[in-house]
């Protein structure tokens, strides 16, 4: 079975088994019945073996009751029978008294230890056990605490509830759980009976004595939880039910009746509130589920139906809306196949994306120019905005109102009383639910202030000198603020107006030809925030106000019942003292809508339960009750709504029966005037056509046909029947108005009409006689005319069936045929008629005939004796009718004969006909008898033949099966051998092709992403983003542990299969033990492993001294003879024939770095350009992969070639490098300080200060190189952090934060005012001093994570172990059922597109990266469009040509390695991220630090269908 169906099946069995774990009263009752029931005899005890059926019957009652609960989820009217409190309270009392009576009937004999019942049959025991457990389980969910029902409801609200396998698994889990309970009770009681019979008897006695009393007491206590309608009011009349719409009882859904806030099914205790003290009950916790609902129901914009909505935090709403705004999808997933066939659409789509790519590149160039002019980088970085309003203003995202800026940093306190005693005026106020007060604590908002302060005052802080150097200490960047934080902190920013970029510049690409109004419609949020009362879309400007945010909070706020009246404490204390802590105050509320004064309350004494809570109108032993406001909003879930129509239609049919049938179901008010006029005109035309054209024409044709058949015409009868037809003009609803038909007038304001026909004309071929018409029942005398000229029973009803035209004609033909048949069967001649007449006149013969007739009648009565008398009467009636028809024909024949013959001839014929009639009856009786005997013999012979045929067929099959068994075995052996031979051939051929592919693809490095080959169908396995995130998480931790991930990794995951393929190509898969791989093998493999290659930004943080160490090693290996030639040459000239064999002393290092001083000076002038390069170029241009290759070159044997090529490119530029963009990884070790304070000459002292760090790094790397295998490297212990230093650092940072918070929030602050001497000392100790805490802790932390090769070893070794245990490696390579990549493309795994750092990027840089991976240019074009962007800022043409030639070589090398992407594949690649929202949210919840991150699971829930 497929894994898509297996996973829900196992989940269903597990959840169904969990539903049976709690032991409720129904199970205890089943065990009691199992113990106590006896057979009924005095000397026989009911043993366990014979009582198994009773326990089984009781468990069947449990299962059947739970099955009814499951049906109640789909059919709410079933559950309404026992949930309604009136019915429930009345029914439950009767059940208890019946059970008490049954307990009294059980007699217990103490001497014999036997239990006796009055009933004797075992069936009564089983039936009683079934009914008792069934009724108790049905009454359990409301009266008794029943976790089984709660678990069942949670199960069916799960995401797999619509899958049939999940339902089957759930039912199987229920059966298995109860089966285990059945077997366990049997085993325990049997062992107890055999090992300790005395204890077994004592248990029976005690259960009989105390079980009934305890059960009844417990049931009555639980019954007190629900009010009885005869004693207590079922519903409070004084509550204003403005929000509850009046509905019929069967239209309400069962959660409304079960959790309705206006129904007293549960006692409600009011929490006491003390206004003077800030108790924890008063404080509103915004992220607590007790105060706010996670799910609520809102009406949709399109159809107005209610849908289930989830309250999203901002961390998920960012991804869901950014993808829609970036991708801008116009079509659904089902239309992708039709799109691929349309080439015109593909061309338009590619051209549109090219234009967008050029637009983004132009914006990058404009930002670079403004950076060169001196503007701040923070102003040019794109802010994360989601959409635009109608005025083209940016609006930030606020899906969850609790995360907005006006609510952030504040506390909420309850301001309302209990919801039971609120008036209409209270709900009209918007700010009536809660009041707002500011916090005085340090929250995230103040921490953000501290970071902003440090970044803005970096100039003042950097002026602090330590001995001889100036080093900046700010290593972080300010958090990207929301739109609200920007508005609140405008006064605190210290930006100069001269440096601010003007608004007229098109930096963000807003001046686009595309209409933003249409774009705004496409970027509508997928999870809307409409109110549940069906309000319209809220204006975006009003959302910024605090009142609107409070109204949104009110929608998801669940009010708790509170009571904060100001009672006099002295009076309460007196009451308590008088009652000796046994009595408590009870408050009775008046019936008025408003709260009464304190004088109107009567304080009677009630039982006090030693709780500081007011019980309200009902007292009980319950704690605090939270009234769930989510269920008050009518939870119209699709599980309940689409079944309500069945009940509504059932009651609607009953109402329609009582209504008059003449009243139509439609209404004319909604129709237009033109439509009414056309319909009335057509009706009147149909009436005229029917009366004057149609029916007269049919009458003429009918009579003409009758004359053709030599029948008399019926003109008079037809015209008289037609004259009886009357046309009555009625209103729209069928009420009679006036006789006659008139044409309607268009200009008259008349109501639409109906035309009624009284005594409608029925056209028949043969009109009935008067006697026949009187015998038949008259049909309906009226009918309505249709627009099509047809008759209906009622207006707008079904078409009336017209009588058959040929009915009487067919009846007459039957009579004629019967007469002719009788005439042919008569054999007697006309000569014997006289003798027959004489014999008939003889009385003896006449008596014989009468005797024969009587004998036949008696014989028929005997045959029909077993039948009912009614059938006999019906048979007699049929005989009489046939005789009557025969007589009518005979009379007509006689009338015709009298015209030509005499009276004597007539007498002769009459005598002959009588004799023929008698002879025909005798012959028919004989024929019936003979036919009966013949049919009986035929059946016997048929059975005998059928039996013989079956026996012969069985014998033949037996013989054939015996002979063919040997032949089948031979064919099976042949098939097995052939299949085995083919498998071996397939194995050898695949090995040969793998060997060829390894040789062909071994030295290639493909960079093109493989997103186009991803399947569009969603998989049910582990998501790829979750795997990548877990790998990243292990990388960031101290000790990586990937084995736990691989245990849950499914066998058919496509990402795992492709990793296996790639390892097979690299030659690593063949090793049985991956622990013994050498370092060189792993380095050769890691340089092509593109998926887990971190970005340049992360390498700069993890290994800042790696580049300096490599440069130092390079200059040490230079021979001394070559150094002199370098010093004598020009600074930028480098000899190509350098040999890297010897080394150099550290003392001459400064001299050798002098030729590269112009490069360092150019880099120092462009400090801001480096930052922007990290943000934009490294994430948008494909050419930056060369930097990663250059980084890997220092680990490989191709070191000489790569370095030689790099220095050769520098020689070609030759001093033209003022504005040259150099890779940021080459400058990660350089300090970033201001341009005007940078020293142009690098002194030897600064180099010596950094040499100890290099020496330290060298020792660590030398230690790693000495280790031969990765297994030994796994024993490397990381540097341990010092906890006391961390605590010291934390305390000092808190002191600095307090000083910043206390300062005034206005303008730019000078260093003399903001920074004191103590704070300067703290800053020096933390950041500037030699033994600074901050940098040391970071270095120790980086040393843990730096060993990335060990991480790769743990990652891939777990995959190899998984493959060696389960499946052969070659079988995995050939399985392509769920493969991500096509079989015809043999290339290594390359997924740079899925780097996790992309989530940090702003939207428009992420879009640029996606567009760069599409490669829209043609095949013959070697230089992509991005190359123009990189050298567009050169001033001279020569510089452009030199730089273009150097970069074109890199592009040519890259394009040789890339596969050409087709146009159709680009669209598939572009649409791929829309099917991966779940993966992106899975990553996003770990990266963005927002509250309540566990709610990302809503993306796993299926979209709720239309209701």
UniProtKB/Swiss-Prot annotation:
Subunit comment? Part of the Tic complex.
What is the role of the protein in this entry? Involved in protein precursor import into chloroplasts. May be part of an intermediate translocation complex acting as a protein-conducting channel at the inner envelope.
Look up and give the organism this protein is from: Staurastrum punctulatum
Q: Which keywords describe this protein according to UniProt?
A: Chloroplast, Membrane, Plastid, Plastid inner membrane, Protein transport, Transmembrane, Transmembrane helix, Transport
* Segments crossing the lipid bilayer: 4-24, 53-73, 81-101, 129-149, 163-183, 202-222
- Topology of the protein relative to the lipid bilayer: Multi-pass membrane protein
| Family membership | Belongs to the TIC214 family.
Pfam families reported for this sequence: Ycf1 (PF05758)
What GO terms fall under cellular component here?
A: chloroplast inner membrane
Location(s), subcellular: Plastid, Chloroplast inner membrane
Q: Sorted alphabetically, which InterPro entries does this protein's record hold?
A: TIC214
Q: Name one GO biological process term.
A: protein transport
What is the protein's name according to its record?
Answer: Protein TIC 214
